[in-house]
Amino acid sequence: MAGHSHWAGIKHKKGANDAARGKIFQKMFKEIYVAATGPGGTDPSSNPALRLAISKAKAKSMPKANIERALDKAKGNAKDGAVFTEIIYNATISGGATFLVITLSDNVNRTTSNIQSYFNKQNAKLGKTGTIPFQFDHKGIMEISKSLVDEESLTIVCLENGAEDIEATDESFIITTSVEDFSTCKSAIESNLNITEFMQCEITYLPNATVTFTGEKAQKIQDFIAKLEDDDDVQEVFHNIEFEE
């Protein structure tokens, strides 16, 4: 199964310094809290959204104590009673680059104003809130270190449990699934291959076609993405750009 996901080419990783890790953990705290306060409740075994949020947090090396604090807050054991709402924004800038920005906000007006301000500087207007641009497909992604499993064994399990694609990079295998088959495939990998650690494990948005930016333009857009990601209300930034040096 060849690499059609574009995942390795377009994902935008932050630096692994303390400030960046703290920002990531803050965002994951909110995601776990929102999942736990949803209709599924605070028990991961009966709440698929919460189970996924915790798996995603663990893949990002979020400490167990932080995860437990998010669950405690959801159970009403914390003093901060902020309520977060998910808002999805989209915009297309010059060059055909399309962005999908997922936010969790306790002040929708503030968040909308901030996101619009970022895109105003790119001479772009926001699309209809909550709309997913046709340039993106909603998919499940799991990334596993090559040190944990051989390709043949992984391929057999994944093919039998709904995987759409397996991509081999220098250090890892990246499995793509439909949203519907994600949990089944993940459970099969965990039980049949004794995998407990994932480098990535989430429901995400993948571009079905990309545009390429190079040189100075690429650097400016990377700086723009970093600014978006640094906003406290922004959980995820997805785009359809491939950067070439």
UniProtKB/Swiss-Prot annotation:
* Cross-referenced PANTHER family: TRANSCRIPTIONAL REGULATORY PROTEIN YEBC-RELATED (PTHR12532:SF6), TRANSLATIONAL ACTIVATOR OF CYTOCHROME C OXIDASE 1 (PTHR12532)
Q: Name one GO biological process term.
A: regulation of DNA-templated transcription
Where are the disulfide bridges? none
This one is known as: Probable transcriptional regulatory protein MAG6590
For this UniProt record, give its keywords in alphabetical order, as a comma-separated list. Answer: Cytoplasm, DNA-binding, Transcription, Transcription regulation
HAMAP family, per the entry: Transcrip_reg_TACO1
Query: Coiled-coil annotation: which residues?
Result: none
Enumerate the subcellular locations listed in this protein's record, separating them with semicolons: Cytoplasm
